[in-house]
């Protein structure tokens, strides 16, 4: 006999966004780790994040989108409990995503960097490391 335990959905507790010189960073504050996938779409330009078994706690309507490649952010539920977040874009970008482990100040996070397509890697200023 086996027992199937329900998997608890992860909550996206908050979404923060800010502009850097060469990219826009979006950080999703999470209640737990998530399983996600990214999809880029053309005509019109969009970036889609599908998050398995997750729910969005706060609305995405108050993000500071001025001076970013993002024109609008929207979300919806797919297949019962999967969350889809869509970034409608004004320009082509190069996305990079990575999870961030909890630390003493924050919990689980997902970082999403949207690099400006017109800036080449060689043009990105080097960051000086201070130990």
Protein language model regions, located:
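C-terminal segment of classical bacterial N-terminal signal peptides
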Residues: 1-7
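Signal-peptide-cleaved, periplasmic/extracellular N-terminal interaction regions immediately downstream
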Residues: 7-131
């Amino acid at each position: 006999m086996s027992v199937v335990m329900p998997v608890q959905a992860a909550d996206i507790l908050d979404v923060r966004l800010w502009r850097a010189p060469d990219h826009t960073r979006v950080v999703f504050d999470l209640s737990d780790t998530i399983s996600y996938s990214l999809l880029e779409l053309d005509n019109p330009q969009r970036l889609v994040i599908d998050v398995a078994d997750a729910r969005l706690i706060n609305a995405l309507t108050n993000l500071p989108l001025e001076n970013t490649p993002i024109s609008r952010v929207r979300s919806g539920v797919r297949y019962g409990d999967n969350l889809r977040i869509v970034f409608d874009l004004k320009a082509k970008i190069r996305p990079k995503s990575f999870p961030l482990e909890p630390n003493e100040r924050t919990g689980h996070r997902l970082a999403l960097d949207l690099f400006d397509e017109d800036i080449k890697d060689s043009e990105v200023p080097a960051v000086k490391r201070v130990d």
